[in-house]
Amino acid sequence: MKKTNPKATKTVYPIICQIVNVIPHQFIAEAAKAHKVLSRTFTPKSHVAAMLYCQVSKTESLNSICDVAAANEALWTSMGVTVPRRNTFSNANAMRPSAMAKDLYWRTYNYLIGIAPDFGRRAHRGYCSRVKAPMFAVDSSTIKLTMNSFDWARHRREKAAAKLHMTLDLGNRLPSFAVVEDAAHHDSVRAAELTAHLRRGDIAVADRAYTDFGFMNGLDARGVWFVTRQKRNMKMEVVRRLMEPAAATGERKTQILADEIVVPAKKSTAAKYAGTLRRVTAVVEVQGQMKTMMFLTNNLKWSARTVAEIYRDRWGIETFFKELKQTCQIHDFIGYSENAVQWQVWIGLLAHLILRYLRYLSKWGLSFSRLAALVRGTLWNRRRLIETLRLYGTASPVKSPARKPKPLYFQAVFDFPSAAVGQQTP
């Protein structure tokens, strides 16, 4: 079947409008009312639309957003919003509570999960499918800022940064909880808050920054399984060996070196975690290199290889952070206050969620960065977005029809002799 490029038509809204319309209109009004956002001309919907355009187009300044909106005023106002003015837009980012953007994100998240259950249940390639319990990765990502402009985010003598703490559902690779704040606090400070919503039987996976005996004891008391890495300075006493120690073979696959039951060796740490832990030592591949790692868990029934593979799935949250920063505007900020930064990060998460949902609807088969680039390049086109994504994302490149060789008219007109130069033809 021949695929044709979807034609532009006046009856279809521009693609930026179709992206904004993924969010039910009443959600913006309800979130604004819940957080007492007052407005006259620059409505909350106008604010959200401008911020979504900033994220999807990766625009770096307020002036650029306002200029593009003014240049495309007829298309911009077709969304039912007003063209932003620089000062009004800047004041909205600084004064309107960022809790509205956070609230809007979770309203939209729950709505999309509700209307498309498969979108919320989809497991990615490499997921440890033999583990049926829900798995959640806990981690944070640092967002570098300029100390001269973002003095509220100063956390070292000459550095400033914000931090995005997150609990990611490893099944669908979508956030289940997130916190945006300055980077002055250690990751472990937010550990209990990030895992408060986990239920009995869920699995929490975290790196060494969250390895704390008090935190692990709280998870164990609630019936939550955990897999984390042992810190280098942790002193553990071996109670029982579940397998004899082995040596690494040099093969490029997960190798189990030791499987032990351990307890904290110091009295001070033993008071924080009174139970026993299981320590699995394995050689795993990290960024193309084989490394030896020690994992701690409170589950004694899983196989040692399953423990290592569960921790391997934790790297899905690293992929999420990389994907978010590559496709959304999380590097350059259009506002300097803490509230403005939080607005931009939460709308960045919202834009990422919408793009992920569009990828699900269109059955996009290429990389996520290519989808974001295609959407970015067609924001003002009047084309049906899903049809456009299906054309470019699911099919192999269309082969051009084979061309018939053209007749050699030059040779037909002039009958060249076949004999060599200087010879006479018979």
Predicted regions and their residues:
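Single, function-defining residue in the core of a domain
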Residues: 1-64, 68, 96, 103-107, ...
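Extended, structured, electrostatic nucleic-acid-contact surfaces
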Residues: 70-79
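Short acidic (Asp/Glu) patches
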Residues: 74-75, 118-121, 148-154, 185, ...
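Catalytic micro-motifs at enzyme active sites that drive phosphoryl/nucleotidyl and oxygen chemistry
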Residues: 77-78, 122-126, 152-156, 215
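Major-groove recognition helix of helix-turn-helix-like DNA-binding domains
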Residues: 78-96
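Short Lys/Arg-enriched helix C-cap and helix-to-coil transition segments
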Residues: 100-116
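Long amphipathic N-terminal alpha/beta scaffold segment
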Residues: 113-129, 145
